[in-house]
Amino acid sequence: MENSRSTLIIFFAYTTIILIGSINCRDNNNNNLVTNQSALFVFGDSVFDAGNNNYIDTLPSFRSNYWPYGQTTFKFPTGRVSDGRTIPDFIAEYAWLPLIPAYLQPSNGKNQFPYGVSFASAGAGALVGTFPGMVINLKSQLNNFKKVEKLLRSTLGEAQGKMVISRAVYLFHIGVNDYQYPFSTNSSIFQSSPQEIYVDFVVGNTTAVIKEVYKIGGRKFGFLNMGAYDCAPASLIIDQTKIGTCFKPVTELINLHNEKLESGLRRLERELSGFKYALHDYHTSLSVRMNNPSKYGFKEGKMACCGTGPLRGINTCGGRMGVSQSYELCEKVTDYLFFDHFHLTEKAHQQIAELIWSGPTNVTKPYNLQALFELN
């Protein structure tokens, strides 16, 4: 018995040394990283935000750095708009990358960026005029990426810096706030211009940023189309006379966006040599879970875990609208598709991430992210 115990101690000590050694190797040898791994650079909004809004001057409603956000995995609020990990966190795990940090996180070091970084900001849009001064819009996220690209070239050397950029995967989720903003501000934009023109601006700004990343050296891109946000808990309670009814004014915008995004990506594939992409049908993935939650292991597909009011669809989770404001929190978060009025639970994020990573072509096409990461 004593000999067995000694053998176990020696074994665990040995494996610990091996593990620590391998971590140190990865941290201290950028050449190995450049040779063997593709980085992950993340652009977008609250669906992808890893905590950038913690470090900008904005309203509490644009932050999630308070309890119960982060309760499941991290056990503290990180700024992610969920009870735990988000889609990029799982994608990084599947790609054997460390957790991708927020760009503005003070602890970031120059050795961290070769693995990738998240520029995403809750509330951000493709249009500069969406929640101006409150968020880091897509154009500003691009500018931050350009700073990282210069830093990579200066720290790794010109050739290796370019290699990180060319082998990296660039993940995008953007646009929903551009469609939400006019309604939340009672804008008359849709009275003065057709919806299709507005959608053209949103998708056009997105593709312009993609072209800029391509020009710098990016070749592999991942996208989520627009989810069924017209039927999220917050949307289901907009018409108080028809609780549970999707918000139809946004439905057409979402459908137009998804059509134009898909056709725009096909056009870029024809125009840009070496451009490869994965487009996940997030709209369908979300809709089927809303309408048939039990099939996917949920009990609630339309009520949020955290919030107040009908379906907990009012944005009060964690006291977002004021410290003294109360909110309700469900007992078992894994029963729920939505964590708050608009955002998914960690369990839901993992399911979606798996489809983006290795899903068949009827849900993620023409490549999935696993295939893109394996391309060099």
UniProtKB/Swiss-Prot annotation:
Involved in the resistance to the necrotropic bacteria Erwinia carotovora, probably via negative regulation of auxin signaling. Possesses lipase and antimicrobial activities, inhibiting germination of fungal spores (e.g. Alternaria brassicicola). Disruption phenotype: In glip2, enhanced auxin responses, and higher susceptibility to E.carotovora. The gene is GLIP2. Pfam families: Lipase_GDSL (PF00657). InterPro entries: GDSL, GLIP1-5/GLL25, Lipase_GDSL_AS, SGNH_hydro_sf, SGNH_plant_lipase-like. PANTHER family: GDSL ESTERASE_LIPASE 1-RELATED, GDSL-LIKE LIPASE/ACYLHYDROLASE. Its EC number is 3.1.1.-. The keyword Hydrolase applies. Expressed seedlings, roots and stems. Keywords: Auxin signaling pathway, Glycoprotein, Hydrolase, Lipid degradation, Lipid metabolism, Plant defense, Secreted, Signal. Residues 1-25 form the signal peptide. Glycans are attached at N36, N186, N205, N362. One of its GO terms (biological process) is lipid metabolic process. The keyword Nucleotide-binding does not apply. Induction: In roots, by salicylic acid (SA), jasmonic acid (JA), and ethylene (ET) treatments. This is GDSL esterase/lipase 2. PROSITE patterns: LIPASE_GDSL_SER (PS01098). Its main location: secreted. It is found in: Secreted. GO terms for molecular function: lipase activity. GO terms for cellular component: extracellular region. Belongs to the 'GDSL' lipolytic enzyme family. It is an enzyme of class 3 (hydrolase). The active site is at S46 (nucleophile), D340, H343.
